[in-house]
Amino acid sequence: MKAGALEIRVRRMNVSDIDRVFMIAWSRTQAPKWTKAAYLSALKKDAMPRRIALVVEDSGEGHAPLVVDWKAPDFVETERSTTAEGEAKSGLVVGFAIASLVPPQAELETIVIAAAEQRHGIGRQLMTAMAEELSAAAVSEALLEVRASNERALGCYRSMGWHEAGMRPRYYAEPEEDAVLMSLALG
């Protein structure tokens, strides 16, 4: 699948992706600051609520290094993930999304694309893949929160059929900000 000039692939997240996912999240100022343990728990098949975790990877060529503004707990810099067998994967993880499921609803808990990879349609491809996964899991409505000041994300979500469903006052901290609650009908 192509996103702009990039060759990308969306797939399920696995344990070997966690260091890179963690690094991407901590390189983005407004991304949720989960611990590695939280990302690992999202991969557990028996976790409640059940989660779907996806990553998007590309060819891995010509990437700008990630810049982390502060020292993240458990931070380990890695360039490429490996498979369970220890072989290098063909692509470099450049973004991820995690949704929690309580059918018939799901909540998109986080979607993060590395800064240097934004504006190439990668987030749109990842959101489309997540919507397909959620539909296959008997979800008929997806919800998400987005910072009220994040006009680029709001515009992208609206263009993909998401609708504003309300506001969550002072939902975000550092800096404190309202969240726009959005919903998407699936299926």
Regions found by a protein language model. Name each.
Residues 114-128, 136-137, 147-155, 159-160, ...:
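Conserved glycine-rich acetyl-CoA-binding loop
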Residues 12-16, 20-116, 124-129, 133-137, ...:
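Acetyl-CoA-dependent GNAT
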Residues 120, 124, 139, 168-171, ...:
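Acyl-donor (CoA/ACP) binding surface of acyl/acetyltransferases
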Residues 107, 112, 121, 143-145, ...:
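Conserved beta-strand segments that form the floor/walls of ligand-binding pockets within enzyme
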Residues 143-146, 158, 163-180:
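Conserved catalytic-core motifs of GNAT/GCN5-like acyltransferases
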Residues 4-7, 50, 102, 107, ...:
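Exposed loop/turn and edge beta-strand positions of beta-sandwich/beta-sheet ligand-binding modules
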Residues 1-16, 180:
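Conserved N-terminal entry element of GNAT/NAT acetyltransferase domains
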